[in-house]
Curated annotation (Swiss-Prot):
Catalyzes the reversible oxidation of malate to oxaloacetate. Gene3D superfamilies: Lactate dehydrogenase/glycoside hydrolase, family 4, C-terminal (3.90.110.10), NAD(P)-binding Rossmann-like Domain (3.40.50.720). Its EC number is 1.1.1.37. The active site is at residue 190. Keywords: NAD, Oxidoreductase, Tricarboxylic acid cycle. This is Malate dehydrogenase. It comes from Polaromonas naphthalenivorans (strain CJ2). GO terms for biological process: malate metabolic process; tricarboxylic acid cycle. It catalyses: (S)-malate + NAD(+) = oxaloacetate + NADH + H(+). CDD domains: MDH_chloroplast-like. InterPro entries: L-lactate/malate_DH, Lactate/malate_DH_C, Lactate/malate_DH_N, Lactate_DH/Glyco_Ohase_4_C, Malate_DH_type2, NAD(P)-bd_dom_sf.
């Protein structure tokens, strides 16, 4: 018995991340090899991006993906999000030369207010939303606050790229396989202030913290490397990390939809007050996923160094929140 197709809306669909993402959604990597999909693709109402989107759709056609039932191109979120079961909000305004962060927040605030309102109006009442476009946590917060009729818990921000970057650095440091790393998490904002935390992590049942046993490396090499990895990639490649971001989006949605089998992953989610994080703050937490729902891993001890790092990333998020308060 074949499954009923689900509707997946993707914004910024003709952009670099969109291009790295859509083929993997259509091939079944995100929702499973037995789950047919309908792609509802949104781009800005400008000739260039709309034309580019048509080209991407031609390529998707040419892949003859068995699971891709239908796809549509849109310039209006009110049609793009119609009955969407999943929405990946990839498109955002990047920071231009000489642009202040406050300006960036304002420009994106307008985009995500409109998209939140559109989701509220027309998406499935159970839509699962992932915000990839930066500043991801605050954009997700804006979308959530603009969609009062949808469950707040269905709005998430992407911290998985930071999580995967941290796992990769730990694998390189220990000489172990990245697939064997468990119980790693990233707290806070998707920004250089994020706190990648391997205090509870294990590889083959052994403590990663004991294996590495080097607080100097943790504070002065590991955390800055993970935090500034995006900038390092722009420096090396001449453009931003698109394929790794798309890969993280696939990981995030797959785990949310299909479950993590008890493994910890990191998701940016609205706080319920856990670990002293103010309610509704869109914050990276350790979670497990089962039956389409995520659950925060509770009861972890927060030592002095960790508390200090969590406070730094929280302060940044509170500042961003204050910066967009007038939009909501």
């Amino acid at each position: 018995m074949s499954k009923k197709p689900v509707r997946v809306a993707v914004t910024g669909a003709a952009g670099q991340i969109g291009y790295a993402l859509l083929f993997r959604i259509a091939s079944g990597e995100m929702l499973g090899k037995d789950q047919p999909v309908i792609l509802q693709l949104l781009e800005v109402p400008v000739e260039g991006p709309q034309k580019a989107l048509k080209g991407v759709m031609m390529e998707l056609d040419d892949c003859a993906f068995p699971l891709l039932v239908e796809m549509t191109a849109h310039s209006d979120p009110m049609t793009a999000f119609k009955d969407a079961d999943y929405a990946l909000l990839v498109g955002s305004r990047p920071r231009g030369p000489g642009m202040e962060r406050a300006e960036l927040l304002a420009v994106n605030g307008a985009i995500f207010t409109a998209q939140g309102k559109a989701l509220n109006a027309v998406a499935s009442r159970d839509v699962r939303v992932l915000v990839v476009g930066n500043p991801a946590n605050t954009n997700a917060y804006i979308a959530m606050k603009s969609a009062p009729d949808l469950p707040a818990k269905n709005f998430t921000a992407m911290l998985r790229l930071d999580h995967n970057r941290a796992a990769s650095q730990i694998a390189a440091k220990t000489g172990k396989a990245v697939a064997d790393i468990e119980k790693l998490t990233v707290w806070g904002n998707h920004s250089p202030t994020m706190y990648a935390d391997y205090r509870f992590a294990t590889i083959g049942g052994e403590s990663v913290a004991q294996m590495i046993n080097d607080q100097e490396w943790n504070a002065n090499v590991f955390l800055p490397t993970v935090g500034k990895r995006g900038a390092a990639i722009i420096e090396a490649r001449g453009s931003s990390s698109a394929a790794s971001a798309a890969n993280a989006a696939i990981d995030h949605m797959r785990d949310w939809a299909l479950g993590t089998n008890g493994k910890w992953v990191t998701m940016g989610i609205p706080s319920g007050g856990e670990y002293g994080i103010p309610a509704e703050t869109m914050f990276g937490f350790p979670v497990t996923c089962e039956n389409g729902e995520y659950k925060i891993v509770e009861g972890l001890e927060i030592d002095a160094f960790s508390q200090e790092r969590i406070n730094i990333t929280l302060a940044e998020l509170e500042g961003e929140k204050a910066g967009v308060a007038h939009l909501l």
